[in-house]
Amino acid sequence: MSQLQVRHDWKREEIEALFALPMNDLLFKAHSIHREEYDPNEVQISRLLSIKTGACPEDCKYCPQSARYDTGLEKERLLAMETVLTEARSAKAAGASRFCMGAAWRNPKDKDMPYLKQMVQEVKALGMETCMTLGMLSAEQANELAEAGLDYYNHNLDTSPEYYGDVITTRTYQNRLDTLSHVRASGMKVCSGGIVGMGEKATDRAGLLQQLANLPQHPDSVPINMLVKVAGTPFEKLDDLDPLEFVRTIAVARILMPLSRVRLSAGRENMSDELQAMCFFAGANSIFYGCKLLTTPNPEESDDMGLFRRLGLRPEQGAAASIDDEQAVLAKAAAYQDKASAQFYDAAAL
């Protein structure tokens, strides 16, 4: 039985001291903790789909979906149910156990909720875990999604409280914490992490992890993203982060949150196989699978499976649904096409 101690009282200087450890010592500590709770050769696989793209009113300086920046991204309306389910079935066939759906909104409108809840129910009927990232949620909206059966809700803190104002001004850090509180209170599992390589200092990376680790309950899933620099965004010309600092961030996240899934998230397309292997050793045990994460590139499935074979890793097995269940879900989705005028409004409009 695991003897790991889970803490929620980490001090900044303690975390900075972990970051400052010699790399071999840090990796040994992180990997030892990882083995206490998880099979080190098993990786949970998620697929992320943008169900509504672009025209977001927020000013996140890293994001190509903001309406404030000219990135050449074409806005798209909320996807039809059948399209979402086709993508979900493809993800499951490729080995994903969780299907994540993201919408470029500040927050979902009440008129969106019935359709979003139905989307959750139909994807779950395929035998997959479900996750959504839709922006800020009210307590009522969180409860609605939980009642519909949504397993996870993603809402990242992005960076430390001190650096946050240099990244985004259209919502506060407390707004983000409030959404996480609503999600946890609803009974859903929390997915929350951040982005590194945004020009922050090492103390900010420590500060981000401090905020996550000192939540009343650790996030169930902690995605750590490397900034993907997109032309047209304010962060397009930032200097690259030292890849070893990314590995350190993964390792410290594993130490601080020993029971959480640590997800090697955006930026893998620009990472070497050797860097990813170090991240898996440091405690990363989840990835996004598929050639695109919302609007940014990601390694091809065949590349990931090739890397898994070389490293002796295997995908975590998820729940299964029968063929009859899947066919019933697709039949129900087709029926939604008859309601297009009522439900497929232009959700990309500001």
From Swiss-Prot:
Assembly notes: Homodimer.
UniProt name for this protein: Biotin synthase
Gene that produces this protein: bioB
Catalytic class of the enzyme: transferase
Functional summary from the UniProt entry: Catalyzes the conversion of dethiobiotin (DTB) to biotin by the insertion of a sulfur atom into dethiobiotin via a radical-based mechanism.
Cofactor binding note from Swiss-Prot or TrEMBL: Binds 1 [4Fe-4S] cluster. The cluster is coordinated with 3 cysteines and an exchangeable S-adenosyl-L-methionine. Binds 1 [2Fe-2S] cluster. The cluster is coordinated with 3 cysteines and 1 arginine.
EC numbers: 2.8.1.6
Keywords, alphabetical: 2Fe-2S, 4Fe-4S, Biotin biosynthesis, Iron, Iron-sulfur, Metal-binding, S-adenosyl-L-methionine, Transferase
Cited Pfam families: BATS, Radical_SAM
Binding, [4Fe-4S] cluster: 56, 60, 63
Co-factor requirement: [4Fe-4S] cluster; [2Fe-2S] cluster
